[in-house]
């Protein structure tokens, strides 16, 4: 009887073994469940975020899909602490097994499955966990759950066959989702502790490894004490495995859990406007006129130029990988090396924030109690209502409700119904109750700004600020938005005069001048300068004091068409510039970036340099895919450049830019202020021998502005931002900018004499053939 029972038992065991062998064989062949092909096992389909680096080696941000913000890090760049913590906690016999730890598996089956001990530990190895992360989909039914573990075991064994232990550890840490948009160990190290993986301390590594058991349960941001308790468990495991001593464990367990939390978000961090601008440039499609509306023809024109002439524009569309597919900015793990300096970028953002916060107080005070605020009193109430109504119709809320079939009356009612919301303020985000319509008006109150700084020799853009806060004000006023430039355009008229034989020392009578415009009507510019009326003054004095009468006199001696042509030669691409006599006062719109690039010609001996944003692009393995060089063009003669340099220095030392000196900038520099009608726009352009920077400040709409010159002129609105920035840049010796650096003029140079040895041919390019046909 006993023999019969034993025989039956052995037959049963044999059958079970055969069934198990058949099941595992079927899984390996892919007959049961999902088994990835060999190619996928050898080359897992990772989605790595693209990293954006500053010139000084800092990570400015990443481009990724929302849940795949993973940045690759190699084994040699991992701290031993993270490796030791992971092995000690998740798989202490990791170096000994081939994917499945039989001892741990048996222990888990007996203690957890039979004895029902909850704290008996798991049986999964690191390799099994990796196989689950890589290839195991979620089980939707009992049958799928039944085969899920055997499938993971088979994949784990195959992974051990194709990869070294170091590679498996690296893959695991790169793959794991640590929550809070921190996918992979590199992003997690920065998100929670503000450091690189190689710099993780023991207790920090233990915290992150502790999350591997259940990231939601042990989220250190939400559950600090619970996460600390789990960290201490990991530290104890490290002590048991011999990675740390008992004394080290005790001292580390006593530490509080301190985070340096930095949530990775494209709307947060440094250079947000720049990163968004760069993203648009890199992923741009080939322009198709059919995709542009009538009011977008200027953009179509610029995109067409950039597609043909700018290798960075549409780079992901123009270039392909080895397999013939186009590069994906969000999943291919590219490394974009930009020209921005993180320190200078921080100084620029701080300068914008500090000044706008102060200026906003004056603006609120001026508009307090005004019924039409933030708009000027010159508008009628009907005009204000129409502007706000147009803003409502452009809002996301309006479009969503309209798409859902809501009537105009229903939409209007929703916009006039108070609700709880969080709004921006310079003191921090505020919770309040207001109607959506009131929120539109509220945000209109805030002044906007655009700032850019670049090296006039290399074209490297060092700082880029498109507005006060990207999270709330996403329209970029550095390179995308354009505003009227006012008097900052005058240097181009004076340049044209120098090219046509004028000298800074030529004298002109300071009286009102009347010109005949293109329609045959008289045009007499107003003039705020009441000094030396009727006296003879120099051309240099006219520019230094931004005098409209002297400007009008020069315009009377020159051709508006030639001025328009020269402006385009300086890199301004606005096709709507009208060649009228009033062109000399800057009634047309230019971006801050275009203006900064144009001004590089003055300290650079007549050579204009286009902005350079990226120096090279590498793939995930560090192979260089593309390099980029600055675009340079001689736009005026050396002689004219020297003369303009002399006059623009006088603007700062003797004229309207004198506030720069009072605010603490002592460097040799030139510059120009600019203010448009009714103080709608305030500008300041300034340059030293090694840095050209420009700033614009104004309201979202042109009818939002100061009503007085005290705070509304360019010297009050924009100049202080430039000054705050330069004081910090020149004060930071690590940047290498010397406050004592001077412009290199020829020895004994006299701008009143024309030195033929300095003369160069004025080179104004003809329009590029064929571009005009794009708009026919």
Predicted segments — roles?
Residues 85-87, 238, 348, 458-459, ...:
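Active-site SXXK
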Residues 256, 480-536, 610-625:
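Short, glycine/proline-biased beta-turn/loop segments that scaffold the active-site neighborhood
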Residues 125, 134-136, 141, 145, ...:
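Active-site-adjacent helix/loop patches that line small-molecule binding or acyl-intermediate pockets
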Residues 118, 245-405:
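Non-catalytic structural connector segments
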Residues 95-105, 183-186, 245-250, 498-519, ...:
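Short, well-structured active-site flanking segments
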Residues 2, 46-49, 53-304, 313-316, ...:
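Peptidoglycan glycan-strand catalytic modules in the bacterial/periplasmic cell-wall system
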Residues 338, 342-358, 389-455, 460, ...:
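A penicillin-recognizing enzyme superfamily signal
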Residues 1-53, 113, 359:
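N-terminal type II signal-anchor transmembrane helix
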């Amino acid at each position: 009887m006993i023999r019969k029972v034993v025989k039956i038992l052995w037959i049963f065991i044999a059958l079970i073994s055969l069934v198990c062998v058949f099941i595992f064989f079927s899984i390996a062949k892919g007959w049961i469940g999902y088994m990835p092909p060999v190619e996928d096992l050898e080359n897992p389909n990772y989605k790595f975020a693209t990293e954006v680096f500053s010139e000084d080696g800092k990570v400015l941000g990443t481009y990724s899909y929302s849940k795949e913000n993973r940045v690759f890090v190699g084994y040699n760049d991992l701290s031993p602490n993270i490796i030791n913590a992971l092995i000690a906690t998740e798989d202490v016999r990791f170096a000994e097994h081939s994917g499945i730890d039989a001892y741990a598996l048996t222990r888990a089956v007996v203690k957890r499955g039979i004895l029902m001990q909850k704290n008996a530990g798991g049986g999964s190895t690191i390799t099994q966990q990796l196989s689950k992360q890589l290839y195991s989909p979620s089980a939707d039914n009992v049958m799928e759950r039944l085969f899920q573990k055997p499938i993971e075991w088979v994949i784990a064994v195959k992974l051990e066959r194709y990869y070294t232990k170091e590679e498996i550890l690296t893959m695991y840490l790169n793959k794991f989702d640590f929550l809070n948009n921190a996918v992979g160990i590199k992003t997690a190290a920065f998100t929670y502790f503000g450091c690189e993986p190689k710099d993780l301390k023991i207790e920090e590594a233990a915290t992150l490894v502790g999350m591997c058991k259940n990231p939601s349960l042990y989220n250190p941001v939400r559950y600090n004490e619970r996460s600390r308790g789990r960290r201490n468990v990991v530290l104890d495991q490290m002590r048991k495995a011999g990675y740390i001593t008992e004394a080290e464990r005790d001292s580390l367990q006593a530490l509080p859990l301190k985070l340096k939390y930095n949530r990775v978000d494209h709307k947060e961090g440094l250079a947000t406007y720049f990163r968004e601008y760069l993203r648009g440039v890199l992923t741009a499609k080939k322009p198709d006129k059919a995709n542009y509306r009538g009011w977008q023809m200027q953009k179509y024109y610029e995109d067409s130029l950039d597609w043909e002439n700018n290798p960075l524009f549409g780079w992901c569309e123009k270039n392909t990988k080895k397999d013939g597919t186009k590069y994906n900015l969000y999943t291919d793990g590219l490394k974009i090396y930009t020209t921005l300096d993180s320190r200078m970028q921080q100084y620029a953002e701080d300068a914008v924030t500090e000044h706008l916060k102060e200026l906003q107080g004056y603006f609120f005070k001026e508009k307090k109690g005004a019924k039409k605020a933030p708009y000027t009193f010159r508008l009628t109430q009907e005009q204000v209502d129409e502007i706000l109504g147009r803003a409502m119709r452009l809002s996301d809320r309006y479009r969503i409700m309209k798409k859902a079939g809501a009537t105009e009356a229903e939409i209007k009612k929703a916009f006039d119904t108070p609700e709880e919301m969080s709004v921006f303020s310079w003191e921090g985000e505020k919770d309040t109750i207001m109607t959506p319509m009131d929120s539109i008006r509220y945000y209109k109150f805030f002044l906007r700004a655009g700032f850019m700084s670049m090296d006039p020799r290399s074209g490297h853009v060092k700082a880029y600020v498109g507005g006060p806060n990207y999270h709330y004000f996403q329209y970029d006023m550095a390179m995308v938005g354009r505003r009227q430039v006012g008097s900052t355009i005058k240097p181009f008229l004076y340049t044209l005069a120098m090219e046509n034989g004028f000298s800074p020392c030529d004298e002109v009578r300071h009286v009102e001048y009347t010109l005949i415009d293109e329609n045959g009507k008289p045009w007499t510019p107003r003039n705020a300068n009441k000094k030396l009326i009727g006296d003879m003054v120099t051309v240099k004095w006219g520019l230094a004091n931004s005098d409209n009468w002297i400007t009008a006199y020069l315009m009377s001696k020159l051709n508006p068409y030639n001025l328009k042509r020269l402006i385009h030669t300086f890199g301004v691409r606005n096709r709507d510039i009208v060649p009228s006599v009033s062109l000399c006062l800057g009634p047309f719109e230019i971006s801050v970036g275009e203006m900064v690039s144009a001004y590089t010609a003055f300290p650079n001996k007549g050579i204009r340099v286009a902005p350079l944003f990226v120096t090279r692009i590498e793939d995930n393995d560090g192979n260089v895919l593309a390099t980029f060089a600055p675009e340079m063009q001689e736009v005026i003669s050396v002689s004219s450049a020297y003369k303009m340099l002399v006059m623009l220095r006088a603007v700062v030392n003797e004229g309207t830019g004198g506030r720069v000196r009072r605010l603490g900038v002592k460097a040799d520099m030139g510059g120009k202020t600019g203010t448009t009608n009714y103080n709608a726009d305030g500008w300041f352009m300034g340059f030293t021998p090694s840095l050209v920077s420009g700033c614009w400040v104004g309201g979202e709409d042109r009818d939002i502005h100061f009503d007085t010159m005290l705070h509304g002129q360019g010297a009050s609105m924009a100049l202080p931002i430039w000054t705050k920035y330069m004081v910090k840049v020149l004060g930071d010796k690590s940047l290498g900018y010397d406050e004592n650096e001077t412009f290199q003029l020829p020895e004994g140079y006299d701008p009143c004499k024309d030195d033929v040895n300095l003369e160069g041919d004025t080179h104004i390019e003809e329009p590029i053939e064929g571009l005009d046909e794009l708009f026919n």
